[in-house]
Amino acid sequence: MLLGLAAMELKVWVDGIQRVVCGVSEQTTCQEVVIALAQAIGQTGRFVLVQRLREKERQLLPQECPVGAQATCGQFASDVQFVLRRTGPSLAGRPSSDSCPPPERCLIRASLPVKPRAALGCEPRKTLTPEPAPSLSRPGPAAPVTPTPGCCTDLRGLELRVQRNAEELGHEAFWEQELRREQAREREGQARLQALSAATAEHAARLQALDAQARALEAELQLAAEAPGPPSPMASATERLHQDLAVQERQSAEVQGSLALVSRALEAAERALQAQAQELEELNRELRQCNLQQFIQQTGAALPPPPRPDRGPPGTQGPLPPAREESLLGAPSESHAGAQPRPRGGPHDAELLEVAAAPAPEWCPLAAQPQAL
């Protein structure tokens, strides 16, 4: 069943035949559509309009609008089909349900409008004209039908009876639908409760197993701490490496300390050698001066002084001034030239000249005798 909104016509499947109900608007209810179709097929009884979308079916209430119900499907509105089903014979023997109050509406359907019942003395409503239309083209305007005077009363009674039947059927379907919904919710709740109970039991069992495992691990750790076993090869190797590193560090520290001591001792030895060299040099210088003085004294004692008429008394002769080591080791002429000048004709001029003219072989053995002294 497809709905053409532009043509304002509703397609309903009745006993496997597609029929088109013209003049349908957004305010047209399911009750009006059912009455029109029942009059068109000429059958009496209880009917219900079913909305089918793919594999799902839903019974429409008498006051629902098929156009609005189809519009709520959105993009699947073109897949919606309406089917008219006959649920049973008409309730001719039952008392009129005009005096019976309508059933209470639950909160889910409380917003649906309730249409007032038509009075018996009111004018007959405008009937809808269902016509079978296998094609999608809109039919042309139908010719007006003139009802006969004798059939008006019968038609009016039939309409009222069909209306009551549709209302009762709509209420029954509504309560059946609500019952099915509540039963489905109850089944869902029970299934969820069972699933939660099973999950709770499973988690409790897992918690107990984990608790037992944790206690076992704690006991093992306590036993391992109280009675340590043989160390693992990795731990022993690591410990040996740490010990070797500590020994090497101590050895390096000792070597560095010994190197520092050796360097300080070497510096002290160098200073001592320098001091000894200086002392030896001073001793050599003093020894040479002593040798020079001894040589001068020996040479002066061996050579008699020449007789001079102007020489003073022997007791007035002063000591011989020592000559410098460097000038004596060098040329005798330089030593004589570097000596302090004395006045010519002094008492020691002849002796100084004789010492300066002495041969060199006699000086060398004396200068080379520091150990004999």
From Swiss-Prot:
Assembly: Interacts with MAP2K7 and GTP-bound NRAS.
UniProt GO BP: apoptotic process; signal transduction
Keywords: Apoptosis, Coiled coil, Cytoplasm, Cytoskeleton, Ubl conjugation
Keyword Transferase: no
InterPro entries tied to this protein: N-RASSF, RA_dom, RASSF7_RA, Ubiquitin-like_domsf
Coiled-coil blocks: 175-227, 248-297
Superkingdom to which the source organism belongs: Eukaryota
PANTHER family: RAS ASSOCIATION DOMAIN-CONTAINING PROTEIN 7 (PTHR15286:SF11), RAS-ASSOCIATING DOMAIN CONTAINING PROTEIN (PTHR15286)
Free-text function comment from the UniProt entry: Negatively regulates stress-induced JNK activation and apoptosis by promoting MAP2K7 phosphorylation and inhibiting its ability to activate JNK. Following prolonged stress, anti-apoptotic effect stops because of degradation of RASSF7 protein via the ubiquitin-proteasome pathway. Required for the activation of AURKB and chromosomal congression during mitosis where it stimulates microtubule polymerization.
Species for this entry: Homo sapiens (Human)
GO cellular component, one term: cytoplasm
Ubl conjugation among keywords: yes
The protein, known as: Ras association domain-containing protein 7
Domain Ras-associating: 6-89
Disulphide-bonded residues: none
Post-translational modification as stated in the protein's UniProt record: Polyubiquitinated and degraded by the proteasome upon prolonged stress stimuli.
First-listed, main subcellular location of the protein, grouped into a coarse class: cytoplasm
